[in-house]
Amino acid sequence: MSNFTAKVPLSERMADVLISKDRWKDDEEGYLKVKYGLEIILINVMKFALVYGIALVTGLLLQTVTVHLSYLWLRRYSFGLHATKTLNCTLISLLMFVLAPFVFQNIPSNNWIVLGTFGFILLNMFLFAPADTESLPLIGEEHRKTLKRKAMIGTLILTGIALLIPFAEMKTLIMVGSLFQVISINPLTYKLLKRRYRNYEKYE
């Protein structure tokens, strides 16, 4: 029994505890959907707690928030790759949002570097955004055009923020978070990781 339990992910065991299967005995499909949704929430909460807990302990909270928000701001409309395994996702999150802020926190940037970097980012948004995944194909040409337009507008807004912010080191962190998102939508990344690109073509 203990060997079986050890092989069950913690998030699944927690979901089993939080959801009473007896209440869903007449709706197995509904139970599985709710359980899966709860597992996703628990995984994200635990990952968030781990990343930000380490950032807090190491004195990197502001740096982590800056990189993470910049990344999420662009990802909202440009989408991009997701790790296929929870462990990989957690490790990548630690590298991106803890290790990278630690490495780049004291590196200043001027506005010429900001303009050059965000020019590159804007070009990538124009060429490659939005990028979908096997589990989340972005169906509909007009929908994709709208997302691309919003991703480019979001890039311009973030460029303005990076230019106006008075802290040279924070400019660097904003660019780091933004470049992480560029990596996640670039077709070369898909190719290197052997992931399918333009998944919507399978449905159109």
UniProtKB/Swiss-Prot annotation:
GO biological process terms held by the UniProt record: proteolysis; quorum sensing
Assigned EC number: 3.4.-.-
UniProt keyword Magnesium present: no
Entry keywords, A to Z: Cell membrane, Hydrolase, Membrane, Protease, Quorum sensing, Transmembrane, Transmembrane helix
SMART domains, per the entry: AgrB
Broad enzyme group: hydrolase
Compartmental location: Cell membrane
Cross-referenced InterPro entries: AgrB (IPR006741)
Recorded GO CC terms: plasma membrane
Superkingdom of the organism of origin: Bacteria
Role noted for this protein: May be involved in the proteolytic processing of a quorum sensing system signal molecule precursor.
Cross-referenced HAMAP family: AgrB (MF_00784)
Protein family per UniProt: Belongs to the AgrB family.
NCBIfam families (UniProt xref): PRK01100.1
Name under which the protein is recorded: Putative AgrB-like protein
Lineage: Bacteria, Bacillati, Bacillota, Bacilli, Bacillales
